[in-house]
Structure formats: structure tokens, C-alpha cells
Regions:
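NTP/phosphate- and nucleic-acid-binding module
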Residues: 1-179
Length: 179
């Protein structure tokens, strides 16, 4: 600055690490991460079922292109891993939505959406894929928010003295709101 050397300075509060930990503690489950769609690096993972059969990989790539064009952060897993491995992998990584398509789905002009938050599987017409995927991601986000809010409210207790706070903490744990 001003063509003169100056000592650099900055502050670091470790906030990014704390926020990541908060998301994991709030939304994680016994199967791994559960990421809210708005912060998930990958919102939807396209998984071709029996991808070596005619047309399946092409159909999966077409779904990927459509999801990306709709503004959804999506990727495809075209590896040779088994379907069960792929499903478990993206469940553990917290990808909010799995999009599966196989030969029978192509025949029926549909795909399967699987939600990470509750495991619900929905058969979706390919004609409404983008709208349904966006609505499902919004529903996942809203559901995670409401569940976290309810958990916070149920585990927050008011205390009017230090003794009361100690007693509440010993009996209930959770959060103490001092008044």
C-alpha cells in the first residue's frame, strides 16, 4: 500500500468449520450427511440403472442436461459400481436427490426420484422432471428447516437463575435461555 511495506493482518474465528459442524450435527443421521439442497454442492445425482443396456446411458445423460439447464446442480455416476454401492455412496455424502433411470423407466417415460431426507421414492414422468425435481428440492429444504426449528424449540428451556439453569441442564440437556 502506498508503495511502502505494511504488516498484513486478518482475523479468523473458525466460523466456516463451526458452520459445517453445525450442519452435520443438525441434519446428519446414522447413514451419513443430510445436506440442505441450497448448500449442497451436488443437488441431484443421476444414476443409470443397468447402464450397459441400449439407450440407458444416453437417457441418463439427457436427464443430466435437462436438470443442469433447469438450474439444478447435478452430476451423473456412470461408473461400473453396483447400483447398491452408488445409492449408499450418495446417501452417505448427503446428496439431497437421487435420480434413477433404467430400461423399464425409459419404456414408461419415467424416472425415479429418491429423497435423501426421508428415503421416499417417487416415479416421475419425464415430461415434468424439471418442475418435480425443483419442487422436491424445495420440499426437502423446507422439511429440514422445520425439523431443525422444532428440535430447537423442544430442547430450549428458560432459566431465571444460575441454579435453575444448572438444574435444567442436568435434567434435560439441550439449550438454556437465560432470562
Amino acid at each position: 500500500k502506498d508503495n511502502q511495506p505494511h504488516h498484513p493482518f486478518q482475523t479468523s474465528w473458525g466460523v466456516s468449520t463451526r458452520l459445517i459442524g453445525g450442519v452435520i450435527m443438525t441434519h446428519g443421521d446414522n447413514n451419513g450427511l443430510v445436506l440442505p439442497p441450497r448448500i449442497a454442492p451436488v443437488q441431484a445425482m443421476v444414476i443409470p440403472v443397468a447402464m450397459h443396456k441400449d439407450g440407458v446411458l444416453d437417457a441418463a445423460n439427457a436427464l443430466l442436461d435437462r436438470l443442469k439447464a433447469a438450474g439444478i446442480r447435478a452430476k451423473i455416476d456412470d461408473s461400473d459400481q453396483s447400483m447398491g454401492w452408488k445409492a449408499a455412496e450418495y446417501e452417505m455424502k448427503g446428496v439431497p436427490l437421487r435420480v434413477e433411470i433404467g430400461p423399464k423407466d425409459i419404456e414408461k417415460n419415467q424416472c425415479v426420484l429418491v429423497r435423501r431426507d426421508n428415503g421416499e421414492k417417487v416415479f416421475v414422468s419425464l415430461d415434468t422432471l424439471e418442475e418435480t425435481a425443483k419442487a422436491t428440492l424445495d420440499a426437502i429444504h423446507d422439511g429440514l428447516y422445520q425439523r431443525a426449528k422444532k428440535n430447537l424449540e423442544e430442547h430450549t428451556f428458560p432459566a431465571f437463575s444460575l441454579e435453575e439453569a444448572k438444574q435444567l441442564q442436568a435434567e434435560h440437556g439441550g439449550f438454556i435461555k437465560t432470562m
